């Protein structure tokens, strides 16, 4: 072996440290003589490396990358020895760590060495699988740190920890060594002393003399050693001057004579502190000392024990007395005493009652209460206290020493196996076993080792546990040995009564390692991989090569040696799998021939891998040149305006057919067409001029290869078409409009006309003007043209006509000549030449939350034909100024002051006018101001409508054509229509916002209420359902119900979009002559976020939990996070409306359903009607179809239908459905299952990416005719119209829980799913079923006959209950039978009916009067309507009519006892029958009845009415 090493030391290898471009690996130079080799390396610029280090280099590089592996075998003199590492100083490792240190505290650095050169050793800590790690070792450096904070003190007792470290080399096979050592946990002063009593209350005789012992204070410390030493002092507080204390023993002495009488007491503060001051730890306690009479003496112990008591730790006799003490009370008249064994704060002071006592008379015995353990506690200090009847006490301390016994069996560390290589000589170390004995003294814990078997193969050192080999092993003969080791301690066992030491047994597996002495070889000499596509992805597997080696320990490493041009491929270092590494190109290389090497660390083998590349269509067509053309605008061409040509780079022959097809990319307006020859034709004429034309038009021509069939590749080429201008545009006016001309002005030039022409041709700028021949005679009379000037022929009177629209014909001078008519808007300026007259106006104000600031609300109006005369008027109050309003005398503007109360105000003014043409005069003006306070809830719960083709002034004003007293503005008409629609009074409806938008639309917000305000989804939902009706009543068009700035996709936001309602206390004013409106400035803005509404309040009677704002305490049954009622049931014909959802990037809908039938619409989110002005077709529908959930989603560009087909939903079982809507995917999951069978995926159709819906979310069904709506909106999939039958629970959308039990609009629902669900089943009818029915019918017939016969036999006295008070009396029996009672005429008691029975000819009229079941009843409206109906009823009786209350016979004056009784009014009336009227009359029954209203039955009562 030494010779081999010497040979290696004289052998050198020249290494090229830079990889060659083709091979990509290190290439060793050819071995030569030392000097020649050295010189050659210097010439080549390479580095000389000794051969003995070459193997390490080869192995290290091979492990790093297969591409860097050497392709030549190592030096032939390499012996291949593999020896195990060994720790240098394992026995000397004795690290210490202080307790309470943080994690990552340094412990120790271990080091192991390996005799083999260039070995890399990795370190690890050996521990059991479920053991919590307390240390971490750096695998490379061997540095050990803590991962745990240790506590040496009670109750943890972490005084030491055994650590086993394993060192493993990187040989083949890897060998290891272990080292076990003890880490001592050192104590620190981290515990303050703890007094052995919670309080000290002692007594002292009144004649006690100075230096007399008063009492003893005792404190313990959990710490160890000097850290546990405690000293005492009396703080200079209270009565400290009377006492002194021994700082070591804690004995308190009297310092000066007592000056207090019996019954009084002294108080001092005693401090116990550690002797070790770093860090300082102390504790304080108050001590009270009562002064007692001199005749009262404390008890004393008769036989105190002053020497320690020694106990073996294995003592198990719990009845035997350990110590006996006797005491006397020192009170002859009261000899009784009471003993107490103090339980201190530590285990050493009996905190866990390790010792107990038993008192018999004045004697006490102490015995064992728990087992002892020397390894935990070595000594105890017991404090026995004796007290007499005067509560005077005396203490005595007993010291107990615990003696160690051999009661622990040695145990082994976690290392259970070792390895020795085959053919190693005798004496080779195999492994080291370590065992430990937990006994506390060296007399019991020294461990020695011996082998129980296999002594002919191995030997063990009895002291160190090192196992060495006694022979040479052959792995092929036997590959492992199970060796049993016995660990014995050094004294007789206390566990077994045999005089032998404790022994621990453990079997260790020693494996015989294999040596690498065989060469690997490939299974094939040549591998072939065909048809590898050139567009194969990186890491695509091409082929796998495999080499075999007879040595089990050999790790074969693979590398590519040559042929890998451009690093196109890579090979798995250990797997042999060849994969694509770089992009391939068939046009560059069509075939690779790789040389692959297999290397086992010593020997190698080679094989060839041929990889053939297959061409794919991966190159787009290439156009031969850039293209442009110039043509005339507005001209058609029959032939090609341009021909383009492209070729396919994948086809080598450019003269061959290139199989290119052409098309127009983004053919807007279908203006172009192109054929496969590249001929571009013009389909529609092109315009060059503004506003819609362009000078240059861009055409994108797309070329696809492979004839456009299958997987084709395309490219797009831009073609520029330039247009030549022709004179095809007529000129138009560009004057600023309107043009003003003052009234009463003499004829003259009004304005110089200016025009423009979009054409660029010569002559386009030379224009002629004239009054159009089609103008009215009035225009032609009053106006004329003078060149390019408009001339006024007459004087104008604004009061006769305020403006004119004059048609001007303008012509250019181009060829051909172009002319057109433009309208000139002329306004006649006003001159104050008319006197004013008295006027009146009305101003309506909504004061939002009563917080309106000073607000201009409108001007004082007087009737005046002049418009521009404000500067000639002066305004003043007619009487005294109003304290709630201020008047601007110059402008007539009325300002409402702050805190103006709600109500109607009549204001009177005097307006004075004086101008050049009108003499000074004054008139009265009257303004009615109505102020209405609007709460915040009305705005938050408001509905909204966006109108078109109407201005805000037109909306609030009464049209001039309807200036009658009963005429209404559009705003008032809307308010009236909404009141009818919501079945409430007009006063309960507020139209409080009227805002004009820049796009000439008008936004109106409104609210309505019964008792609370109606939810916005109810308002918007009902209005949307009746949109056509409202449009007809108002003669207006609605662009949108529920104003939603996010409805049009990507109009406001590119991604998520949420509407936010902005509200301002500053009012918004709209002014017209006779009407002004001051409303709330409330509007919706789009926020580009996805946020669910924050639910900060508790619903349904819940209350916030104290100190937790987001937690609610709810009433039973309301289980939502904010007391929502989270369930609702439907019965197949109902529905419920809830708030809509926002358009989000990621919308998650989760709900639970319990179906009863297998068909029905569960959820619908989409439009409620068809609006041709804004045909948004987005919708979502979730339905059951034959028990399977089906989800249909349309983002507005096509519907996708997702059908789950794995889990069929059956009746009475609850299922969870999760829906995730994303921009590019739609997912539906059943029962929160993540398997592919439980998930159903789909992708949106078309370019749209969001669900944009502003209608309410509908559950259980919908009132919308989905079939008709689907036809109008061109839906490709129409949801099922049939309603859902079952229960829906726990609906959350984007983590917002819905209050399902409280919908805003509903029909046929069961909130909370409380009612039982009845389901119909069909039974088959067979012969047995028919027989059973016949038998049942026969039994019923027999029972009926028996009842009839029995009734015939009943006594007549029992037939009194069949009396009837109807007109045809069946049997009238009363005491006046001989009188003419049977002649009682019931017709006199009949009154004329209040209402006649009338058939409604118009079924819609009846339907219109029906209250919606969701409406909250308004009792005031109800009574008012009923009163109005009674007042208007022409068929009602007169107010004064005769009512007969007591009448018998035909004027008979005879009486009887019965008749007297029936007419008397002297007795109390009996109202017990009220309880039978049901729960609605329960209060009346409780007020007037004698019996409780909740009586189960009144059938036996005298006047029990049966309803």
Swiss-Prot record:
GO terms for biological process: apical protein localization; asymmetric cell division; axonogenesis; border follicle cell migration; brain development; branch fusion, open tracheal system; calcium-dependent cell-cell adhesion via plasma membrane cell adhesion molecules; cell adhesion. Residues 262-1328 are extracellular. Residues 1350-1507 are cytoplasmic. It comes from the Eukaryota. Residues 1350-1507 are annotated as: Interaction with Inx2. It is a single-pass type I membrane protein. Its main location: membrane. Interacts (via cytoplasmic region) with Inx2 (via cytoplasmic loop). Interacts with Hakai. Interacts with Myo31DF. This is DE-cadherin.
């Amino acid at each position: 072996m030494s010779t081999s090493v010497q040979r290696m030391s004289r052998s050198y290898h020249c290494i090229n440290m830079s990889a060659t471009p083709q091979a990509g690996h290190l290439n060793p130079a050819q071995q030569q003589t030392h000097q020649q080799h050295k010189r050659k390396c210097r010439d080549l610029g390479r580095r000389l490396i000794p051969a003995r280090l070459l193997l390490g280099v080869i192995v290290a590089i091979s492990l790093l990358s297969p591409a860097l592996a050497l392709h030549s075998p190592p030096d032939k003199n390499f012996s291949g020895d593999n020896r195990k590492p060994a720790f240098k100083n394992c026995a000397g490792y004795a690290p210490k760590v202080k307790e309470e240190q943080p994690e990552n505290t340094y412990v120790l650095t271990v080091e192991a060495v390996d005799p083999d050169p260039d070995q890399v050793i990795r370190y690890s800590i050996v521990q059991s699988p479920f053991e919590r790690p307390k240390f971490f070792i750096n695998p490379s450096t061997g540095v050990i740190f803590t991962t745990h904070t240790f506590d040496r003190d009670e109750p943890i007792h972490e005084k030491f920890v055994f650590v086993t470290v394993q060192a493993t080399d990187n040989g083949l096979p890897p060998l290891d060594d272990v080292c076990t050592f003890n880490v001592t946990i050192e104590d620190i002063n981290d515990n303050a002393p703890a007094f052995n009593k919670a309080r000290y209350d002692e007594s002292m005789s009144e004649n006690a003399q100075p230096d007399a012992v008063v009492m003893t204070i005792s404190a313990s410390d959990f710490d160890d050693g000097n850290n546990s030493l405690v000293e005492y002092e009396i703080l200079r507080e209270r009565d400290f001057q009377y006492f002194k204390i021994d700082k070591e023993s804690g004995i308190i002495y009297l310092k000066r004579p007592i000056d207090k009488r019996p019954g009084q007491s002294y108080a001092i503060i005693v401090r116990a502190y550690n002797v070790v001051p770093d860090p300082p730890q102390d504790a304080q306690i108050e001590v009270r000392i009562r002064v007692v009479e001199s005749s009262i003496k404390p008890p004393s112990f008769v036989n105190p024990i002053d020497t320690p008591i020694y106990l073996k730790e294995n003592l198990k006799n719990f009845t035997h007395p350990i110590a006996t003490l006797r005491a006397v009370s020192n009170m002859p008249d009261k000899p009784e005493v009471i003993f107490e064994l103090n339980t201190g704060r530590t285990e050493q002071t009996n905190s866990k009652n390790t010792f107990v006592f038993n008192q018999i008379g004045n004697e006490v015995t102490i015995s064992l209460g728990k087992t002892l353990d020397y390894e935990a506690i070595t000594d105890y200090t017991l404090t026995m206290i004796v007290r007499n009847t005067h509560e005077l006490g005396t203490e005595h301390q007993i010291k107990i020493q615990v003696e160690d016994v051999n009661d622990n069996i040695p145990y082994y560390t976690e290392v259970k196996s070792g390895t020795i290589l085959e053919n190693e000589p005798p004496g080779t170390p195999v492994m080291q076993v370590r065992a430990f004995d937990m006994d506390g003294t060296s007399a019991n814990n020294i461990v020695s080792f011996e082998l129980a078997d296999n002594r002919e193969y191995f030997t063990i050192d009895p002291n160190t546990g090192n196992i060495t080999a006694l022979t040479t092993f052959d792995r092929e003969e036997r590959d492992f040995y199970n060796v049993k080791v016995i660990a014995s301690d050094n004294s007789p066992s206390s566990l077994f009564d045999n005089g032998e030491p404790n022994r621990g047994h453990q079997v260790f597996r020693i494996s015989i390692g294999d040596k690498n002495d065989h060469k690997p070889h490939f299974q094939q000499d040549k591998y072939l991989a065909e048809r590898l596509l050139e567009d194969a992805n990186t890491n695509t597997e091409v082929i796998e090569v495999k080499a075999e080696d007879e040595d089990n320990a050999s790790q074969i490493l693979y590398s590519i040696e040559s042929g890998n041009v451009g690093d196109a491929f890579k090979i798995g270092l250990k797997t042999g799998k060849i994969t694509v590494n770089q992009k391939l190109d068939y046009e560059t290389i069509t075939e690779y021939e790789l040389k692959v090497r297999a290397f086992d660390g010593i020997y190698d083998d080679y094989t060839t891998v041929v990889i053939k590349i297959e061409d794919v269509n991966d190159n787009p067509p290439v156009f031969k040149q850039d293209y442009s053309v110039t043509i005339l605008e507005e001209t058609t061409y029959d032939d090609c305006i341009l021909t383009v040509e492209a070729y396919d780079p994948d086809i080598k022959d450019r003269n061959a057919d290139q199989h290119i097809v052409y098309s127009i990319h983004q053919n807007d307006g279908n203006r172009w067409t192109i054929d496969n020859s590249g001929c571009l034709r013009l389909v529609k004429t092109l315009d060059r001029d503004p506003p819609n034309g362009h000078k240059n038009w861009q055409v994108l021509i797309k070329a696809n290869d492979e004839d456009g069939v299958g997987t084709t590749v395309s490219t797009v080429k831009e073609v520029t078409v330039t247009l030549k201008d022709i004179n095809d545009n007529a000129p138009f006016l560009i004057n600023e409009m309107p043009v003003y001309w003052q009234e009463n002005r003499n004829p003259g030039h009004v304005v110089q006309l200016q025009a423009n022409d979009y054409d660029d041709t010569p002559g386009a700028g030379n224009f002629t003007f004239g009054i159009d021949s089609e103008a009215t005679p009035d225009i032609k009379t009053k106006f004329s043209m003078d060149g390019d000037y408009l001339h006024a022929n007459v004087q104008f009177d604004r009061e006769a006509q305020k403006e004119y629209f004059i048609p001007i014909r303008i012509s250019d001078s181009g060829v051909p000549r172009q002319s057109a008519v433009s309208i000139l808007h002329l306004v006649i300026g006003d001159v104050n030449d008319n006197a004013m007259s008295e006027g009146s106006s009305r101003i309506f104000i909504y004061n939002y939350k009563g917080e309106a600031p000073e607000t201009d609300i409108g001007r004082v109006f007087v009737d005046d034909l002049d418009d521009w005369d404000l500067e000639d008027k002066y305004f003043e109050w007619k009487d005294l100024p109003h304290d709630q309003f201020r008047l601007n005398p110059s402008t007539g503007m009325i300002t409402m002051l702050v805190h103006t109360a709600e109500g109607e105000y009549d204001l009177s003014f005097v307006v004075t006018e004086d101008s050049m043409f009108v003499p000074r005069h004054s008139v009265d003006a009257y303004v009615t101001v109505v102020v209405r306070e609007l709460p915040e809830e009305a705005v938050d719960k408001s509905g909204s409508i966006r109108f078109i083709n109407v201005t805000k002034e037109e909306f609030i004003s009464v049209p001039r054509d309807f200036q009658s007293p009963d005429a209404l503005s559009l705003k008032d008409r809307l308010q009236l229509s909404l009141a009818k629609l919501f079945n409430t009074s007009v006063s309960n409806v507020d139209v409080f916002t009227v805002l004009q938008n820049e796009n000439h639309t008008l936004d109106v917000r409104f609210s309505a209420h019964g008792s609370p305000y109606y939810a916005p989804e109810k308002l918007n939902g009902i209005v949307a359902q009746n949109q056509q009706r409202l449009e007809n009543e108002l003669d207006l068009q609605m662009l949108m119900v529920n104003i939603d700035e996010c409805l049009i996709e990507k109009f406001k936001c590119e991604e998520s979009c949420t509407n936010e309602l902005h509200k301002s206390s500053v009012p918004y004013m709209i002014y017209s002559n006779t009407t002004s409106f001051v409303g709330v400035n409330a509007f919706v803005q789009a926020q580009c976020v996805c946020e669910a509404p924050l639910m900060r309040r508790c619903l349904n009677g819940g209350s916030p939990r104290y100190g937790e704002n987001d937690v609610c305490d709810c009433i039973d049954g309301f289980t939502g996070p904010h007391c929502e009622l989270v369930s609702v049931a439907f019965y197949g014909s109902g529905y419920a409306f809830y708030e809509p959802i926002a358009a989000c990037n990621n919308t998650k809908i989760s709900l639970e359903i319990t179906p009863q039938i297998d068909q029905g619409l569960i959820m619908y989110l989409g439009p409620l009607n068809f609006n041709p002005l804004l045909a948004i077709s987005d919708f979502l529908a979730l339905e059951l179809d034959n028990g399977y959930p089906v989800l249909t989603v349309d983002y507005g560009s096509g519907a996708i239908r997702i059908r789950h087909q794995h889990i069929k939903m059956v009746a009475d079982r609850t299922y969870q459905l999760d829906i995730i809507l994303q921009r590019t995917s739609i997912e539906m999951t059943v029962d929160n299952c993540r398997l592919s069978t439980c998930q159903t995926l789909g992708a949106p159709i078309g370019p749209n990416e969001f669900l944009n819906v502003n209608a309410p979310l509908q559950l259980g069904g919908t009132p919308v005719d989905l079939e008709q709506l689907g036809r109008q909106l061109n839906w490709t999939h129409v949801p099922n119209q049939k309603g859902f039958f079952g229960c829906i629970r726990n609906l959350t959308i984007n983590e917002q829980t819905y209050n399902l039990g409280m919908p805003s609009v509903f029909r046929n629902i069961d909130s909370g799913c409380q009612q039982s669900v009845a389901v119909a089943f069909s039974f088959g009818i067979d012969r047995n079923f028919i027989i059973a029915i016949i038998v049942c019918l026969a039994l019923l017939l027999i029972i009926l006959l028996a009842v009839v016969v029995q009734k015939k036999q009943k006594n007549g006295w029992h037939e009194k209950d069949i009396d009837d008070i109807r007109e045809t009396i069946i049997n009238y029996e009363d005491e006046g039978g001989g009188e003419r009672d049977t002649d009682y005429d019931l017709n006199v008691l009949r009154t004329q009916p209040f209402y006649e029975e009338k058939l409604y000819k118009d079924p819609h009229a009846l339907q219109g009067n029906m209250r919606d079941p969701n409406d909250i009843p308004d009792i005031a409206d109800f009574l008012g309507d009923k009163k109005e109906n009674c007042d208007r009823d022409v068929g009602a009786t007169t107010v004064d009519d005769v009512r007969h209350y007591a009448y018998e016979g035909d004027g008979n004056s005879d009486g009887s006892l019965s008749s007297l009784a029936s007419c008397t009014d002297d007795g109390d009336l009996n109202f017990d029958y009220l309880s039978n009227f049901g729960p609605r009359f329960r209060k009346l029954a409780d007020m007037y009845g004698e019996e409780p209203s909740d009586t189960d039955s009144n059938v036996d009562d005298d006047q029990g009415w049966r309803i």
